[in-house]
Amino acid sequence: MLDLGCGDGTTAIPEAMLGANVLGVDIAENLVAAGNARARDLGLSNIRFQVGDASQLSELADDSFDLVVSIFGAMFAPRPADVAREVVRVTRPGGRIVMGNWIPNDPTLVAQILRISAAYSPPPPEGFVSPITWGIDDTVIERFAAAGVPADSVSLERDTYTFDFAGTPSQLLALFRDYYGPTMNAYAAAAASGREADLHTELEALFNEQNASTEPGATTIPATFLRVTVAV
């Protein structure tokens, strides 16, 4: 199994604990180091993490994996057409690709975080393709078609990821502020333009409004995403 945009192993490590042979690839060296440290601490010899770009997997051979997974990861890689081609290339015939992608204009948490963050961030460079276009059905089908996968081999469905957090919405926001790339970048840009307080107020209101928990000091926020399953 290959996990692209693996972070420190949120998906990859549980799969390895179930017995899969897993390679995790992420662009962030600190997350790769953290993933390898977690694997060592757990005594897992069937998983490793390495630095890499989901749009350029030249170090990986064709037809290397039975399963390629990317949950909210490869969607943020540059050159989405290259991402589609690369994940198809490294998947064995008869294998599967599974992606979880946030959906543009969705009213739930992460799509709204990305919308708000973009409003406080500098304009993207010319030619930039928004990562959230990976949440558009027709766009996903077109990208995999260009990689040689017919539309009837691509399955798309709406699904829900639930943030269950043993803390307040403000404390969950603090984690996003410190560790989630789009939010980190938005806070940095807002601080530079003197709008950090406005950004924080807007995001804090969002987290509080979306919290479905009735327990004091707890947070439960559902977020809708597009689950993409590709038969290769």
Residue ranges: model-predicted function:
Residues 81, 96-169, 183:
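Conserved catalytic/acceptor-binding region of the Class I
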Residues 21, 95-96:
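Short glycine-centered segments of the SAM/dcSAM-binding site in methyltransferase folds
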Residues 153-215:
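C-terminal helical/coil "lid" or tail adjacent to the Rossmann-like core of SAM-dependent
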Residues 147-149, 223-232:
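Core SAM-dependent methyltransferase catalytic element
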